[in-house]
């Protein structure tokens, strides 16, 4: 085993606290800082929100208009939101735009949007 391989093995055996202490000791010994330059972190930080937007996992179904068949839409709203009574479902449909469901998977959001659209509502998945 070479000298470098032995060193790698020994460093791999360090605990996190020991590795942090080693880092501090080396910074003092060599007169350097382990912190990344601020300018280098800027572009990476700007790219992160774009990636997060592409990886959206939670969606909201928004009822934008109740349509002409409000009774059917109210029935479907009560079907997807059993916690709502008749009055609350009616108020939600008549008060459009309103969020019907929030923080659901894409598949569930699309299923709910399809049901409401078939009932005569105009919906949007965000």
Swiss-Prot record:
The keyword Ribosomal protein applies. One of its GO terms (molecular function) is mRNA binding. The keyword Ribonucleoprotein applies. One of its GO terms (biological process) is translation. One of its GO terms (cellular component) is cytosolic large ribosomal subunit. Keywords: Ribonucleoprotein, Ribosomal protein. Belongs to the bacterial ribosomal protein bL12 family. NCBIfam families: L12. Forms part of the ribosomal stalk which helps the ribosome interact with GTP-bound translation factors. Is thus essential for accurate translation. Homodimer. Part of the ribosomal stalk of the 50S ribosomal subunit. Forms a multimeric L10(L12)X complex, where L10 forms an elongated spine to which 2 to 4 L12 dimers bind in a sequential fashion. Binds GTP-bound translation factors. This is Large ribosomal subunit protein bL12.
């Amino acid at each position: 085993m070479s000298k470098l391989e032995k060193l790698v093995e020994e460093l791999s055996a360090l605990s996190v606290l020991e590795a942090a202490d080693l880092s501090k000791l080396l910074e003092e010994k060599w007169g350097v800082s382990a912190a990344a330059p601020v300018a280098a972190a800027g572009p990476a930080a700007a790219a992160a929100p774009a990636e997060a937007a592409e990886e959206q996992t939670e969606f909201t179904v928004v009822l934008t208009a109740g349509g002409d068949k409000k009774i059917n839409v109210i029935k479907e709203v009560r079907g997807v939101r059993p916690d709502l009574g008749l009055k609350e479902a009616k108020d939600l449909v008549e008060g459009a735009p309103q969020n019907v469901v929030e923080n659901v998977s894409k598949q569930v959001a699309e299923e709910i949007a399809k049901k409401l659209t078939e009932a005569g509502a105009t919906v949007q998945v965000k």
